[in-house]
Each structure stands twice: as structure tokens, then as C-alpha cells.
From Swiss-Prot:
Enzymatic class: hydrolase
Segments passing through the bilayer: none
Positions contributing to Zn(2+) 1 binding: H70, D103, E166
Record's protein name: Succinyl-diaminopimelate desuccinylase
Keyword terms, alphabetized: Amino-acid biosynthesis, Cobalt, Diaminopimelate biosynthesis, Hydrolase, Lysine biosynthesis, Metal-binding, Zinc
Organism: Shewanella putrefaciens (strain CN-32 / ATCC BAA-453)
Protein's job: Catalyzes the hydrolysis of N-succinyl-L,L-diaminopimelic acid (SDAP), forming succinate and LL-2,6-diaminopimelate (DAP), an intermediate involved in the bacterial biosynthesis of lysine and meso-diaminopimelic acid, an essential component of bacterial cell walls.
């Protein structure tokens, strides 16, 4: 059997062929549910608003090992820039091309095949295996994993370990696993002024001029030094808008959006307090609202990290590097329940880009890694 026809590749191609742009699922979870049901999983669809979710579980006892992931993908972008149609999975020179190949339908296929192999070899395994799958990870993340977790928490159903299939690898499969993520906090700020004619500035109040010293100081503030697990907290101004577009009108307001990626050395409350103190110090007339996108989390030494390190070394021959860099994932909704969370998936070089692709051999190796992790934890 060639790599192109490995079971993982075949399932990945089937999933990629379904144009499941957020929040659509397009039957991906039904396909996965059929495979899981055949090996003894209880399937529980959870539909919230426009989002399709699935909680699948095999076993009634703890510990509970959970594969977590998403069937939705980001939009394709300019289709004319793709080598092949993004929803017609194609293998070229050992790489599988298609939207979602790396983020994260390749991982989903590897999870399913690894679980099938594990259950066949170990039908009486310890504990339980679960799948938490959503179609709302790439979007507003309102009705996806967070709603499933709320449902599980309400009935006191706990996850012990969660392995998220996000594309964690950097240069080669398994060189990096994510054992934590920074917190994310967004501020939406409006600086108020008085609109007027640029020739009569004494009759107006320019909010851009008023805000400039504040923004300069905000961008230079030192928030913390980070620690051995997290880099220092960073703040980036993401959007600024003011004015009507005309050159002869002083704007009446300036809108600024900024985002913190913060370590465990500070809290969202501390960041908010410092920003609002700075606003008051500059005597600005403002409105501000805050969006909490997720708390920081960290999975330290223990069975999940040990099993993952062992699996990657056994399959690839090299050691992995646990890191907390990068963006957020749905792991941030699982970790607050007390679960230990790691992310392990394909190389992330092409995610969200045109011509997204994954190495075919990597998908088979990823499935082997997942299978060894299951053996280490549930045998």
C-alpha cells in the first residue's frame, strides 16, 4: 500500500472534500460518527444555533482521554491562486493539498484511524476515550467547544486529558507540542472629541491629537517579564479608525482596537486596571469595552506530557519541544475544567494560506503518535 492510499490519507481526503467553512460542518461529523459508532462509541450530537458539535465516548469510567478538534475551515481566499481546487483534495509530490489539510482535517483523520487501531488491539482498555468536535473554532467560538464544555460540566462529566489536533509542528512533525497558551484580552476603545472644520480647530476638539500621547505610552508599556513557561505579555494595536475620509473635517471620535496576549504573571483584571488608569492620567473622554478571549493555561510534567514525548520519540526518533507560543485554540475552554491539555498536529507552515498542504507521510506518523499515546495512558 502506498502512502497515498493509507487509511489516514483516504479519510483526510474525504473530509477535505466537504466545504465546511465556519460554521458549516457539511457532514464531516456524521462521517466521523459512523466510524466511531462502529467501534463502540456512544454518539451525542450537540447542535447550538448554527454550530454542529459532537461528543462521542467509549467507556463509562475514568480516566477520560479526549481527542479535541474542529471540522470547520477558514475561507479559501482567491481560488485562482490555488494550484488545485481547494475542496478537491489532490496529492502532488507527496503532499496532500486542500483547505483544511493541515488545519485540521488531517489531524481528525489521524485521530479516527489511531482510535480504530487502538480499540481493535485493546478492546478492554482502561478508562474512556472521547471525541469533542465542533464546527465553530475558526469563527466566533460562541456555540462550539465552550457550549459543549458547559453541558459536560452541568452533568459533572470530566475530561482527564485532552489532546487537541491543532497544527503545532514547526519544521517537522512533532518537533513542537503546545503545552499551554497565553491568555487573550481585547479592548475596544472610543476616544471622544468634537467634530468640526479643520480651518477652525478652536471650535472643535480633535480626538486623534488627544489620543496620540496615550497611544504612544500604551505601546511602550512594560507589562511583565514572563516566566520560564511564557514570554512577556505583549500588547498590539490592531485597528484604528477616525474621520470621515474628507481632508477638511476634524473627526468627532477615534476608535482603537488592541489586543493583549498575556502570561500567567498578570491577570486580565490587572491589565484592565492599568489601561484605564493610563486613560484617566491623560484626561481623555472615552468609552471602553473588553472582550475576554481566553485565560492562559499550562500543562506541566505529568502523564499526558510524558506519553506524548514518548510517542513522538518512538515514532519519529527525535525529542519534542513543549512551547506556549502562538495563538489561541479551543484548549483554553477545556483547561479551566481541570483537564490537562496538549496540542499535537501537523506542520503549520501553510495553514490559512492558499495551497494549504500536509505531507502524506506525516499523517500516517501522526496517527501512530496518537495510537502510542493512547497505549501509554489507557493500557
Amino acid at each position: 500500500m502506498t502512502a497515498e492510499h493509507f487509511p489516514v490519507t483516504e479519510l483526510a481526503k474525504d473530509l477535505i472534500s466537504r466545504p465546511s467553512v465556519t460554521p458549516l460542518d457539511e457532514g464531516c461529523q456524521t462521517l466521523m460518527a459512523e466510524r466511531l459508532s462502529a467501534i463502540g462509541f456512544n454518539i451525542e450530537p450537540m447542535i447550538f444555533e448554527d454550530t454542529t458539535n459532537m461528543w462521542a465516548r467509549r467507556g463509562n469510567q475514568g480516566p477520560v482521554f479526549c481527542f479535541a478538534g474542529h471540522t470547520d475551515v477558514v475561507p479559501t481566499g482567491d481560488i485562482s491562486r490555488w494550484h488545485t481546487p481547494p475542496f478537491e483534495p489532490t496529492i502532488i509530490d507527496g503532499y496532500l493539498y486542500g483547505r483544511g489539510a493541515a488545519d485540521m482535517k488531517g489531524s481528525l483523520a489521524a485521530m479516527i484511524v489511531a482510535t480504530e487501531r487502538f480499540v481493535t488491539k485493546h478492546p478492554d482498555h482502561q478508562g474512556s476515550i472521547a471525541f469533542l468536535i465542533t464546527s465553530d473554532e475558526e469563527g466566533p467560538f460562541i456555540n462550539g467547544t465552550t457550549r459543549v464544555i458547559d453541558t459536560l460540566e452541568a452533568r459533572n462529566e470530566k475530561i482527564t486529558w485532552a489532546l487537541v489536533g491543532e497544527p503545532s509542528s514547526t519544521l517537522k512533525l512533532g518537533d513542537v507540542v503546545k503545552n499551554g497558551r497565553r491568555g487573550s484580552l481585547t479592548g475596544n476603545l472610543t476616544i471622544k472629541g468634537i467634530q468640526g472644520h479643520v480651518a477652525y480647530p478652536h471650535l472643535a476638539d480633535n480626538p486623534i491629537h488627544k489620543a496620540a500621547p496615550f497611544l504612544a505610552e500604551l505601546s511602550q508599556m512594560h507589562w511583565d517579564n514572563g516566566n520560564e513557561f511564557f514570554p512577556p505579555t505583549s500588547m498590539q494595536i490592531a485597528n484604528i479608525h477616525g474621520g470621515t475620509g474628507a481632508s477638511n473635517v476634524i473627526p468627532g471620535a477615534l476608535e482603537v482596537m488592541f489586543n493583549f496576549r498575556y502570561s500567567t504573571e498578570v491577570t486580565a483584571e490587572i491589565l484592565i486596571e492599568r489601561v484605564e488608569a493610563l486613560l484617566k492620567a491623560h484626561e481623555l473622554d472615552y468609552d471602553i469595552s473588553w472582550i475576554f478571549n481566553g485565560l492562559p493555561f499550562l500543562t506541566g510534567e505529568g502523564p499526558l506530557l510524558d506519553a506524548t514525548r514518548y510517542a513522538i520519540h518512538q515514532v519519529t526518533g527525535y525529542d519534542t519541544s513543549p512551547q506556549t507560543t502562538g495563538g489561541t485554540s479551543d484548549g483554553r475552554f477545556i483547561a479551566p475544567t481541570g483537564a490537562k491539555v496538549l496540542e499535537l498536529g501537523p506542520v503549520n507552515a501553510t495553514i490559512h494560506k492558499v495551497n494549504e498542504c500536509v505531507k502524506v507521510d506525516d499523517l500516517e506518523q501522526l496517527a501512530l503518535c496518537y495510537e502510542v499515546i493512547l497505549e501509554q495512558l489507557l493500557c
